[in-house]
Amino acid sequence: MKKLMGIALAVAVLAYAINLLFDAGVFYRVQDINLQQCQKIPGISGAEDIAPLKEGGALISSLNRHDNAPGALYYFQQGQAPLRLPGDYPAEFYPHGIDVWQKGTETWVYAVSHGSRGDRIETFRFERAAMRLVYQPELSRSVGKNINDISVIDKSRWLLTRDHAFSGMLGRVEDYLRLPLSLVLLVDDAGEHTLLDGLHFANGIYYNPQRGRLYVAETTNGTVSSWAWRPGEASPVLLGRFTGLHGVDNIMPDGDGLLVAAHPQLLKLAAFQKDAQARSPSLVWQLSLGTQGAVERSQIYYQSHGQALAAISVAAPLGGRILMGSVFDDGLLTCGEQ
């Protein structure tokens, strides 16, 4: 009996390990797709996230994660070099996910920043005519730890992803065991509230206020979940989970659908983080939505072994093309018909 139990346990552990390796993309075959229509844009490091502007151009979160220097926000317009925006940045500014809120002629920029005392949302007003940022301390605030991305509802209400419950070694254990301990937080004038829990490495987030639809990328199980929710409602209603997307990262709207950047081989992403010569593959999905707003279909827009830009973490429509950035690599990639 003990022998049978031991065999059953060994089989269960082996099956779990194989499933874990599958989710990490170890068995995923990378094929180069749509490389010929892409152009590399130098002049920026660690462009983890992109926020397109309604009047054209985009703001970009930039941080060289291979040194300890603070980061910055950049402005980019098709056909021009990335411009580092001057402004009164906080002393500790290490940006990750960003979003913008625009009303009339004014634009506010919200950036997740990882500081020595925890994470903050640092808020700026973007003065387009002067091409500069003005820090808004009254709209900035501490938000705990392990915050990854932000989707802005309005000037003082935001949705945040908390990708891990723990940091350091315990955070790695959380990943290896695929523990569903990740959250989506609603931040408003009353404080921080848990909107969703039980998620696997909640990463990118996008909220469509017109349709009342919320989308969350769960990295370690390669899923984008779709939810119906509007401010004032108690809990989001799950519309569906679309699986098989491999290491999903940031989510961006693209017409009637979504663009989702992904890391198809997560172990290579971890290696690239430590060694810039160990290129990490890149993948961008185009997702189609059904009549209820849930993700229903997917197709690959771009895929590579990381030759031009490794570890692509975001893809956003801009000026009739698709602009891509990477969390760990240098430069941008712009793709599409000229």
What are these regions (language model features)?
Residues 60-70, 112, 160-179, 260-281:
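Short, conserved, GDST-rich strand-edge loop motifs in beta-rich repeat architectures
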Residues 71-114, 250:
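Blade-loop segments of beta-propeller domains
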Residues 208, 245-302:
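Loop/turn-rich, solvent-exposed surfaces of beta-rich toroidal or solenoidal domains
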Residues 26-30, 55-87:
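Beta-propeller domains
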